A protein has these predicted regions:
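Extracytoplasmic beta-strand/coil segments of soluble accessory domains associated
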Residues: 57-98
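Repeated loop/turn-to-beta-strand initiation elements of outer-membrane beta-barrel proteins
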Residues: 151, 178-181, 191, 222-225, ...
Length: 421
């Protein structure tokens, strides 16, 4: 007997079109991670793109947690305030290496173009002892665009009603799976007199800046190396406007002039010794040469700062809950200052300052899941000018629930004072 069944095939079809609901794209605010032991906020590119043109100082205009104000409106110098204290107590870092300090601090917020930044990390209070002893009220770390990021070329041009012009160009090339390089260019020009209140003084200085950065990155499973070279030329002219109606042709107008040349080199190396225990060793080197010629009316002040910094770090997880980090650092500053209070004196006061500071640090971290983190640390440094000093710091984070996180930090901070630089 033969039995047969009818088999029917079902035909499926896929629609060629599909209508989506409305999608709204918005820039994101700064991100605060509840898992970090320090009180840190990360400002990413989603918030940085809110400003059509910006530099580091202008990027905080949309962030209420950082107060940026003019310390000298005539020259355009700005400062950051954290916890109510001025920027001299805020440590500046570029990719976790101390930078933009000393003679470069007054105008440092204008030295970092906005399109170059990948993110900004703002920490309030005493920071980790890994990065030195200079953080008192907080720390700002700048992460630049990485060569191993998007391959290609990007460009943007900006001009406003005051004829301020900005040109930014960056491009990266992936030579192979491990090696990549990138070049970033920035040009800024503002030459119009701006006197909104009609008092005869320019509200902001005329500015011309050329900025160049070149980077290399090598990334392998056990070794990461990053090299950065950078050059900057910055000119600022301010003071009384020549368009002032009350200024006679024979009247000597008050003017300010700041001409700066700055060069940097930064080399970071990280070696993974044991991936299971996150055991690694890192070597970081940084050098800078900063030269500024300043005229404030009849007062002349010229300064040159040469800085060298080296740091060696070792870090490992002892167990799942215990981590230890130890390291050594060496910082050297060489200042050459020339001061002429009247600009006509036959002899100019000169001063040379040399400071070398080696240091050691140790930091321990205890983590109990996502509930409790305790991170004590201590460092010892010795300055040839001020002797030895200890910097103890303690960070505690406690999260009793998913919506509540409590943090506290206790610590000391130091800085070397310079009357003019």
């Amino acid at each position: 007997t033969f039995v047969s069944q009818q088999i029917s095939a079902q035909t499926d079809s896929i629609a060629n079109t599909h209508e989506l609901k409305n999608v709204t794209v918005k820039a994101t605010n700064g991100i605060k991670s509840k898992y970090r032991v320090d009180n840190a906020e990360i400002i990413g590119q989603g918030q940085l793109i809110r400003a059509a043109c910006c530099n580091l100082g202008e990027s905080f205009t949309t962030n209420p947690s950082v107060d940026v104000s003019y310390s000298d409106a005539a020259t355009g110098a700005k400062q950051i305030k954290l916890l109510g204290l001025s920027g001299t107590y805020v440590q500046m870092l570029t990719e976790n290496i101390p930078n933009l300090r000393g003679a470069s601090l007054p105008y440092s917020l204008g030295y970092v173009p906005g399109p170059w930044m990948q993110s900004i990390q703002v920490s309030k209070g005493a920071s980790s002892v890994k990065n030195g002893y200079e953080s008192t009220t907080g720390q700002i770390n700048i992460e630049f665009l990485k060569p191993q990021g998007t391959d290609g070329v990007r460009a943007n041009v900006y001009q406003d009603s005051e004829l301020k012009t900005e040109v930014n160009l960056d491009g990266s090339i992936h030579l192979n799976d491990r090696l990549s390089t990138a070049t970033l260019l920035h040009f800024e020009n503002r030459q119009m007199d701006h006197d909104g209140n009609g008092d005869g003084f320019m509200d902001m200085p005329k500015l011309r800046q050329y900025n160049l950065m070149h980077r290399w990155a090598y990334v392998s499973p056990r070794w990461i190396s990053q090299l950065m070279l950078r050059g900057l030329h910055d000119e600022r002219e301010g003071g009384q406007s020549r368009k002032h109606a009350n200024a006679a042709s024979s009247e000597l107008l008050y003017s300010t002039s700041v001409k700066t040349n700055r060069y940097e080199m930064q080399w970071k190396n990280g070696f993974t010794l044991n991936a299971d225990h996150n055991t690694s060793i890192a070597l970081m080197l940084h050098g800078s040469w900063h030269d500024a010629d300043n005229m404030f009316g009849a007062t002349q002040y010229d300064v040159t700062q040469k800085n060298g910094y080296a740091q060696l770090m070792f870090e490992t997880d002892i167990t799942e809950n215990h981590n230890i980090s130890v390291g050594a650092s060496l910082n050297h500053d060489y200042y050459t200052e020339q001061f002429n209070p009247l600009g006509t004196l036959p002899e100019v006061e000169s001063k040379v300052t040399k400071e070398t500071t080696p240091g050691l640090y140790a930091q321990y971290t205890y983590k109990l899941g996502e509930t409790l983190t305790v991170m004590p640390g201590v460092r010892w440094d010795h300055s040839n000018l001020y002797g030895s000093f200890f910097t103890p710091r303690l960070h505690i984070k406690y999260s009793p629930s998913n919506i509540v996180t409590l943090r506290t930090s206790i610590g000391k901070g130091y800085r070397s004072p310079h009357a003019l630089a």
